[in-house]
């Protein structure tokens, strides 16, 4: 059975170092897709690079935890900025869902304005779209527009919650992250997916060159390690040996 493998690099547009790392991992490695933060400091730079790489799938990385929102969000921001207090608000069930739905539409339009095309798919920074309160908003938004959505099926409590016409990969892994970033780790993800019989798999990654913006991230130098592994010739060969076909979300 042929399996489609999407290796999606998150955080396109976060910084120039992030952008260059993603492009390097696409040109000389196994990355096939990326998702862009439209409020990132280097989003225009990301869009410029993407025009030179028309085969690179570019989706939208919905942001509710970093930087300035595109629209006014008084119910979620503090001093005009987004932040990680969204987790506490989710636990307290005090999320401003109308503001979030409006911000999603505004970020989507901003993506189209910057990239000149619709995104191939949607996911989110820090996986906030998988919050139980937010997921239905994003899932129906994606389904209405006919674009795919990253779904962590271990988080979705009920498959009936998914719109029938929503596209996604059968499998998703965020395990290529943290302290153990190795070729063996990546291949274990593929083998586990194949064992489950999944015909399509998305693996999340964050390859980057370190710059001043990346240094401010709690997840900094492992991004360099990711880049090294993802551009390994032996990894590309091992993926091919396992019968995976590189693809993007337009292929599912």
Curated annotation (Swiss-Prot):
It comes from the Bacteria. This is Chitooligosaccharide deacetylase. Mg(2+) binds at residues 61, 125. The keyword Magnesium applies. Its cofactor is Mg(2+). InterPro entries: COD_ChbG_bac (IPR022948), Glyco_hydro/deAcase_b/a-brl (IPR011330), YdjC-like (IPR006879). One of its GO terms (molecular function) is deacetylase activity. Involved in the degradation of chitin. ChbG is essential for growth on the acetylated chitooligosaccharides chitobiose and chitotriose but is dispensable for growth on cellobiose and chitosan dimer, the deacetylated form of chitobiose. Deacetylation of chitobiose-6-P and chitotriose-6-P is necessary for both the activation of the chb promoter by the regulatory protein ChbR and the hydrolysis of phosphorylated beta-glucosides by the phospho-beta-glucosidase ChbF. GO terms for cellular component: cytoplasm. Its EC number is 3.5.1.105. It is an enzyme of class 3 (hydrolase). Homodimer. GO terms for biological process: chitin catabolic process; diacetylchitobiose catabolic process; polysaccharide catabolic process. The keyword Signal does not apply. Belongs to the YdjC deacetylase family. ChbG subfamily. Keywords: Carbohydrate metabolism, Chitin degradation, Cytoplasm, Hydrolase, Magnesium, Metal-binding, Polysaccharide degradation. It catalyses: N,N'-diacetylchitobiose + H2O = N-acetyl-beta-D-glucosaminyl-(1->4)-D-glucosamine + acetate; diacetylchitobiose-6'-phosphate + H2O = N'-monoacetylchitobiose-6'-phosphate + acetate. It is found in: Cytoplasm. Pathway: Glycan degradation; chitin degradation. NCBIfam families: PRK02134.1 (NF002559). It holds the Pfam family YdjC.
């Amino acid at each position: 059975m042929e399996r489609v493998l999407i290796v999606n690099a998150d955080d396109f547009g976060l910084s120039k170092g992030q952008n260059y790392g993603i492009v390097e991992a696409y040109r000389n490695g196994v990355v096939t897709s990326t998702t862009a933060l439209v409020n990132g400091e280097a989003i225009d730079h990301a869009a410029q690079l993407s025009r030179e790489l028309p085969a690179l799938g570019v989706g939208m990385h919905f942001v509710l935890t970093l930087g300035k929102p595109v629209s006014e969000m008084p119910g979620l921001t503090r001093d005009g900025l987004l932040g990680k207090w969204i987790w506490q608000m989710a636990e307290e069930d005090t999320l401003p869902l109308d503001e979030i739905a409006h911000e999603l539409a505004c970020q989507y339009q901003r993506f189209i304005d910057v990239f000149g095309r619709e995104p191939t798919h949607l996911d989110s920074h820090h996986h906030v779209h998988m919050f139980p309160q937010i997921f239905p908003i994003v899932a129906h938004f994606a389904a209405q527009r006919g674009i795919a959505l990253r779904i962590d099926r271990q988080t979705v409590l009920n498959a009936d919650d998914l719109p029938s016409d929503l596209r996604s990969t059968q499998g998703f892994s965020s395990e290529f992250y943290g302290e153990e970033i190795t070729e063996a780790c990546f291949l274990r993800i593929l083998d586990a997916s194949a064992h489950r019989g999944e015909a399509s798999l998305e693996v999340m990654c964050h390859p980057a060159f370190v710059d001043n913006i990346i240094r401010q991230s709690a997840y900094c130098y492992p991004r360099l390690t990711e880049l090294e592994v993802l551009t390994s010739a032996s990894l590309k060969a091992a993926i091919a040996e396992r019968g995976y076909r590189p693809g993007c979300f337009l292929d599912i």
